[in-house]
């Protein structure tokens, strides 16, 4: 089995404990190394780990692959890491990197044009107020560094009406997807997974929002 999103090891542990199959685990975030070491100690040769992205899955040269699983989105450990600025409940620098990234969220917010920000919020977050939010960001960054709490204030200032979900949800989702190239990674990961999977193998994908579903 290939577990493409090792995280805290939930899927890998269940598979290793409930059958005799081996696990090949991937994760682009090297902060999982301590958990990886525990798995190596407990499961020995039945467990292998690679610090790689979805799009690198074809670099794994293994025979007899039966199934490949993708559990999309962030792990609880990543969300609770306040230094990443992934959650709109955190404070400080906007980072949002999962690992093996070319740029951070701070780079996006501080350098990209108003039009580019608009497109990110619109296409990856389906944000109705993408235009005024992107405009406010460009205005504010002329005078100060925009941190997580500042971005939340901008969004709440634009979106006056109450809604069922947190007002910042769509913008933060869009930024996370863009910074980590999540859709591109998923597309390449699925294409390459199909290529390396033998006839009769299975691919499972756990999604969390409509953009991933599409």
Predicted regions mapped to residue ranges:
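S-adenosyl-L-methionine-dependent methyltransferase catalytic core, i.e., the SAM/SAH-binding region
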Residues: 1-214
């Amino acid at each position: 089995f290939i577990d493409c999103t090792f995280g805290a090891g939930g899927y890998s542990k269940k598979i290793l404990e409930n059958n005799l199959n081996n696990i090949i685990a991937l994760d682009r975030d090297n902060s999982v190394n301590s958990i990886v070491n525990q798995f190596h100690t407990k499961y020995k040769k039945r467990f292998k780990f690679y610090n790689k992205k979805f799009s690198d899955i074809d670099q794994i040269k293994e025979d007899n692959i039966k199934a490949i699983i993708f559990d999309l989105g962030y792990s609880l450990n990543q969300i609770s890491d306040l230094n990443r600025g992934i959650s709109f409940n955190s404070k400080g620098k906007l980072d949002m990197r999962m690992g093996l990234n070319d740029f951070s969220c701070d780079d996006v917010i501080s350098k990209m044009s108003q039009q580019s920000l608009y497109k990110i919020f619109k296409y990856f977050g389906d944000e109705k107020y993408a235009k005024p939010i992107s405009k406010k960001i460009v205005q504010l960054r002329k005078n100060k560094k925009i941190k997580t709490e500042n971005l939340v204030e901008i969004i709440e200032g634009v979106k006056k009406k109450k809604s069922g979900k947190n007002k910042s949800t769509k913008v933060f989702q869009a930024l996370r997807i863009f910074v980590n190239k999540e859709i591109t990674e998923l597309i390449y990961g699925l294409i390459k997974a199909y290529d390396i999977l033998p006839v009769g193998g299975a691919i499972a994908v756990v999604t969390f929002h409509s953009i991933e579903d599409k």
